[in-house]
Every structure is written in structure tokens, then in C-alpha cells.
Amino acid sequence: MGNLVIGSRGSELALWQANHIKERLKKECLIESEIQIVKTKGDKILDTPLNKIGGKGLFTKELEELLLKGEIDLAVHSLKDVPVVFEKGLDLACITKRADVRDTFLSVKFPDLMSLPKGAKVGTTSLRRSMQLKMKRQDLDTESLRGNVQTRLKKLECGEFDAIILAEAGLCRLEIQGAKYRKAFSVEEMIPSMGQGALGVEMLKNHKHFATLQKLNDTESAFCCRLEREFIKGLNGGCQIPIGVHASLVGDRVKIQAVLGLPNGKEVITKEKQGDKTRAFDLVQELLEAFLQSGAKEILEKAQLF
């Protein structure tokens, strides 16, 4: 049999992730593989904010189509980009050990968020980040920032933005300092996106190597990420709407923190649940119920208008 074909987007970060899985497949599963670069809708449309492009799976749909046709064997995704409902026949074969889940502030001139001047221009791809920035600083001008990590950093260095927000995991994977000033927000300061920091490997469920890839699965990361995905699923949410959710395990206890609101930070719900690990999925349902009772659906409908 020939090598397995790994589908990946073409950015430096996406290829780092695909090569990471390629190396682990060889070392831990004794499987040889090769990488095929695939351009997704989200890669092709770079002059429009992600939430304006519309639809779910902006960075995954084309890869999923190739999986269904049998043209690639597996697709490596940033888990935060993976829709919570799969095309028929597809599923996650594994979720890798999480890297740093935090979001990071980067600036050439200003050491942290609170030192930015009034009206400072902050670049981010994410409505979730915009919302949480506005919760702290209504006076900031948050603007869409598209492109790969290096492109975004160049825009910062050229003075297009006073600061930008990126995922800490991506900076660490590419071994990039990023800017003179770099400061990660705590999870309490900025709740991450579902699955942030983890990779998801998607395959046909009936693929002969689907079960084999469990060797690459990290039990704790997968457990926490599945809780987060369950929360998003309950709100019928995706990665282009302003929702943050983070689950963490300490011993036998689980903590789930979530935030949801308008991108302008003016209507926001923030709640958390803690309890025994054995009740984890019940806690997600309780958290969902608390959000729905606080008007989550209505806020999300309003958020679509931004």
C-alpha cells in the first residue's frame, strides 16, 4: 500500500501542524505519509472579515470534500476551526495534546492592553477576541486582520495596527517572538475559542487506519475539547461568532468557563461551572441552560447583524 495522504492548508503554521502529525504517524503508528496542500475558502478570500464570508467550515470544507472522495486519507486542522457537526461518514480520529490555549497581545510600542492610547487600532480575526477586548476597553478600535501569522506581524511592524491579538500556540509552534512587546492574557482575562491549542485529525470513520490514530490521541485534551464542542453545539454556534469556552481538569474536578456576547462588548454573558469529572457533560448542559435563560439565543441573533 502507498503512503497515506495528509490534507493540509498551505500556511507555514498549517504545514507545521501537518508535519507534526506526519512525524508522529511514522514514529508511533509506523505509518508513512505525504502532505497534499489544499486551498480552502477561508484562504482564498482575504479581503473580507471571516464573519462576513458566511457559512461554517471556512477552513475545512474543501478538505472534507477530498476526504469523502477518498483523495486524501486524513485532514489536519486547528481544532478551533472544525465545525461541531460533521459531514456524514466523517469524524475526528484523534485530538492531540493541547499546546498553550491563551490569546496573546503583541505590540511594537505598547507593553500591554491597558497602556494603549484611546482609539488605538487593534487587529484580530476573531469576533470573540474583539468582544473581550471591548469588555475591557470600549474606546479601542478593533479591526479585521486577515492573513497568515507572518502577514499579520508585518502589518503590525509597518504601523497599520497599534497592537494585534494572536493565539499563543501558533507563535510557540513557529518559534516566533512576534514583536517587542508580547503578553499572553490569562484564561480569565480572555476565554479562548473551543479547542484552541489542540489539533484535530479528521478521517472517514470506516477508514482502515481510523482506530490506529487513537495512538495520537491525548485523553485529557480530548475530554476537555469535547466538553467545549458540546457547549458550542448546544448553542448552534461556530467559530465565526463571539463565543469563548474553556474546560480544564484539575485532578477529578472539571471547570468550564464560557463567554458570549455582541462583538462591541455591550451585551455579554459570562458564566462558569465546576464539579466532579464524572458529571462533566451534565455540567455542560447546566451551563447551557444558564446561558439560554440569560438570553444567549437572542444575543447571538443580534450578533449576526454585526
What is each PLM-predicted segment?
Residues 1-46, 52, 135-306:
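Small-molecule-sensing regulatory modules
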Residues 12-24, 55-59, 84, 104, ...:
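N-terminal winged-helix
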Residues 48-73:
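Short, structured active-site "lid" loops
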Residues 66-68, 82, 87:
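Extracytoplasmic loops/domains of multi-pass membrane proteins
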Residues 72-76, 162-163:
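Short, Asp-centered acidic motifs that coordinate Mg2+ and/or phosphate
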Residues 79-80, 88-140:
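A conserved helix-loop-strand patch within extracytoplasmic ligand-binding domains
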Residues 79-82, 169-171:
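Short glycine-rich anion-binding loops that position phosphate/pyrophosphate groups of nucleotides
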